[in-house]
Amino acid sequence: MGPMGLAAGLLAKALGAPLTVGADVVESRLDLGRRLGAIDAAVPADDHAAAAVRGLTDGGCEVSIDCSGSTAGRLVALEGARRWGRCVLVGEGNRLDVDVSRVLIHRQLTVLGTWVTSVWRMEELVERLARWDLHPERTVTSRFALADAAEAYRVADEGLGGKVALVTDG
């Protein structure tokens, strides 16, 4: 439940998702997701995470999203999706080795990869954030002056909280 996962959860709730489930290896990030209302339920991102997600969602998520970019996170998203479900991979990096027949083909899973959106989509999102009264700045857990950028990067690299922001005086 890093910044992207928190944002995905908040947007899913705004779009009417009846249940959002977060998975992370860091408990404090799951706590933050609960406090912000981004997730309704949390599972530890371990070897049993996909099974736990399927148990909470009556067989799997209609839509699962991996924002981590980690191999383990991607597998949880793929295996936590229901038959005929959709899985969106957002996080950058790493490789993915998956049993294509078992995980994708036999379950009729649709997998989407996405990166950066277009300007008009971003404008649409900003308008909707205002209409839905969503405030993504709530995902910011640490703020640093530009002069403290090295410390900000250290905190972000620890991966224990939400978004880390560099701010200016003006």
Q: Where are the model-predicted features located?
A:
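A local structural motif
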Residues: A17-P18, G60, D133-R138
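Mid-domain Rossmann-like dinucleotide-binding core that forms the NAD(H)/NADP(H) cofactor-binding site
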Residues: M1-D46
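Glycine- and other small-residue-rich loops at beta-strand/loop junctions that grip anionic moieties
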Residues: M1, G22-A23, A42, E62-C67, ...
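C-terminal hydrophobic helical "lid"/dimerization subdomain
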Residues: L75, V119-G170
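Rossmann-fold dehydrogenase core element
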Residues: R86-V88, D99-T139
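Residues in the short beta-alpha loop(s) of Rossmann-like NAD(P)-binding domains
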Residues: V25-V26, G93, T117
